[in-house]
A protein has these predicted regions:
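N-terminal nucleophile
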Residues: 1-149
Length: 149
């Protein structure tokens, strides 16, 4: 079982821990940062889609917000961490294929590295091949009907 705690700190009151409830279906734990002003209303729009309750819905909204943001503090390659709700699993970092380049935790990975130990996703949250940078042959399509760009 997972638990989540948001730690904050201020000079006046020091550290504070707020327990975050983990949803029963795929969803958001918390939205932080200046980009939340654009993400939150966009997520309300995405929650009306047939994909509501699926992790790809959250990712589609994140990518759509990132690609269309007016906030100069937001941008760059997306970073993705996932939590599987299956017994005996851990959280995982995902590689992202973004603008035909490979990224892991926001850092571009060079050519010539072994990519098969990383689980890859493309901008549509489709399972991708880290070597070819294309959707994996066996991957299901994950169209984003609300994508603005």
């Amino acid at each position: 079982a997972f638990s989540c705690c948001l730690f904050t700190w201020t000079a006046k009151s020091g550290w504070h821990c707020k327990n975050i409830e983990i949803p029963n279906e795929s969803g958001i734990l918390c939205v932080l940062g200046s980009g939340s002003k654009e993400f939150n209303p966009n997520y309300e729009r995405y929650c009306t889609s047939a994909n509501s309750g699926a992790s790809r819905n959250v990712f589609h909204c994140f990518i759509d917000t990132l690609f269309n943001t007016t906030d100069p503090a937001c941008g760059g390659p997306p970073q993705l961490v996932g939590i599987y709700r299956k017994p005996g699993t851990n959280a995982a970092n995902f590689g992202i294929i973004y603008n035909k380049k490979r990224y892991l935790l926001g850092m571009e990975l060079p050519d010539g590295v072994t990519y098969d130990t990383i689980e890859w996703r493309n901008e549509l949250f489709e399972i991708a091949d880290g070597s070819t940078k294309k959707k994996a042959h066996s991957a299901a399509s994950q169209p984003d009907p609300f994508r603005r760009k």
